[in-house]
């Protein structure tokens, strides 16, 4: 087998917008910032929460004259 053909697999820190952070390993080589993690995602927390990305829900409601 050929040597040195695989990317480097290093430890990175993933930080969520809720403030939660954890360490994992990745070939990306830099830290990640994510919007939703298992600590704040409605499926894992059991709380109903509307996740609006870039105002898309508001644009939809405005287009069809729906109340919030």
Curated annotation (Swiss-Prot):
GO terms for molecular function: metal ion binding; rRNA binding; structural constituent of ribosome. Binds 1 zinc ion per subunit. SUPFAM superfamilies: L28p-like. It comes from the Bacteria. One of its GO terms (biological process) is translation. Belongs to the bacterial ribosomal protein bL31 family. Type A subfamily. This is Large ribosomal subunit protein bL31. It comes from Nitrosococcus oceani (strain ATCC 19707 / BCRC 17464 / JCM 30415 / NCIMB 11848 / C-107). The gene is rpmE.
